[in-house]
Amino acid sequence: MAELIIVDFQNISIFILLCLFSFLCYALFFKKPKGFDLPPSPPSLPIIGHLHHLLSSSLPHKSFQKLSFKYGPLLHLRIFNFPMVLVSSASMAYEVFRTNDVNVSYRFVPVNKDSLVFGSSGFVTAPYGDYWKFMKKLISTKLLRPHALELSKGNRAEELRRFCLDLQGKARKKESVEIGKVALKLTNNIICRMSMGRSCSEKNGVAERARELVNKSFALSVKLFFSNMFRKDIMGVSREFDEFLERILVEHEENLEGDQDRDMIDHLLEAYRNEEAEYKITRKQIKSLIVEIFLGGTDSSAQTIQWTMAEILNNPGVLEKLRAEIDSVVGGKRLIQESDLPNLPYLQAVVKEGLRLHPSAPVLLRVFGESCEVKEFYVPEKTTLVVNLYAVNRDPDSWEDPDMFKPERFLVSSISGDEEKIREQAVKYVTFGGGRRTCPAVKLAHIFMETAIGAMVQCFDWRIKGEKVYMEEAVSGLSLKMAHPLKCTPVVRFDPFSF
């Protein structure tokens, strides 16, 4: 009996020592400044933390939204041993980017660093630093500057014309089309011509090959969180992209063009050859950026076009008003063009409302580079920042009837021309990221979406099965998609090519 008591005492002593040791480790490595508390946190479970809260829906943004409705717009969560801060309101998102813009300009380090697809050589995945700053400047002052967009306007007009002619062919055959697919072909062809210029055409197969590789990459995005398990697949697509883009680079180097015909690759190669550049970029970084331009500029715009067309078809009043605006501005003898867009405020409002309700990436992920304070709460370094853009853009404290499709909310007349209200709306409207890492191609994306939707509304009536388009959501990788792709049959309403 005495021996058992001694053994029990020893076990208790060991247990107490382990508890003390654990407490000391926590105090040393996870201590926070005096007077600071972590953001509020829902009830958690041992080991898994708050994982069970995220299993309420197959859609992560919906699970996060449900949590924020119940516990508040700023939450501290833990998934196993990974800490995160969840932001779910416009005011809280504004506060984070206002006070910690640089600190939250960091992203996750990709597992497959060597890959051109989702790797670490690109601009989007690059850590905040000299390379990222140099590329941001190059994109803003060379690749997407207003003069460059003006020079490439003719290519975009050609592709829009081809897009409408293809739809006319479907209409004559009374064939249905999948809006997402035809929109993806349009955006892919435009990006191809803007980035590769003379190397890209339907005839030489370059545009088709680019589409094929983009589709393979999107298929891999579903496996992104298990990239160690699918490294072979990811690296396989990366090698295909590398071989494809190397041929394009060599072709550009062998056939240098004048300033009038320069495309994105020409500008990137110029920076690559410049020995006095602020930062010396590599061929791999050029290829990674082109891959990111294709992945970021094609599917996201195509998905928004699809979602917005679905909303338009479900709201006949919006369709009628939008069509009347286009007819009055464009007239009855030509196709809508980019120069019309500033005179089409309702079309702009329709696209903004589509983006508000259906952001292509519903959840924004960043990393706090250093410990900091957010609304008097302490956030440790290396904590993951999760901004639920879906919830932010449907925040009932910021938007009237937040779940309804009401483009009028974006018309200046609807907010009485009050500059303060206009500024407030800009703060709460977050669709292309936030802070200094906001997408630099916002203007180009709006051109894609507004001209495509404008042309489809101007030139065609659309027949759907049933009375309404089914709007169920699905998530593929980090993208918000329609669970049931929008299929409808075009009927020619106006032929702009008959004059």
UniProtKB/Swiss-Prot annotation:
Disulphides: none
Location within or outside the cell: Membrane
Binding site residues for heme: 439
Pfam families: p450
Domain of life: Eukaryota
Enzyme Commission number(s) of this protein: 1.14.-.-
Keywords (A to Z) from UniProt: Heme, Iron, Membrane, Metal-binding, Monooxygenase, Oxidoreductase, Transmembrane, Transmembrane helix
Membrane spanning residue stretches: 4-24
InterPro entries registered for this protein in UniProt: Cyt_P450, Cyt_P450_CS, Cyt_P450_E_grp-I, Cyt_P450_sf, Plant_metabolite_P450s
The keyword NAD is assigned to this record: no
PROSITE patterns: CYTOCHROME_P450
GO CC annotation: membrane; plasmodesma
GO molecular function terms attached to this record: heme binding; iron ion binding; monooxygenase activity; oxidoreductase activity, acting on paired donors, with incorporation or reduction of molecular oxygen
Stored SUPFAM superfamilies: Cytochrome P450
Membrane-related topology note: Single-pass membrane protein
Listed cofactors: heme
Similarity remark: Belongs to the cytochrome P450 family.
Job description of the protein: May be involved in hydroxylation of the triterpene marneral.
Name of the protein: Cytochrome P450 705A12
Organism of derivation: Arabidopsis thaliana (Mouse-ear cress)
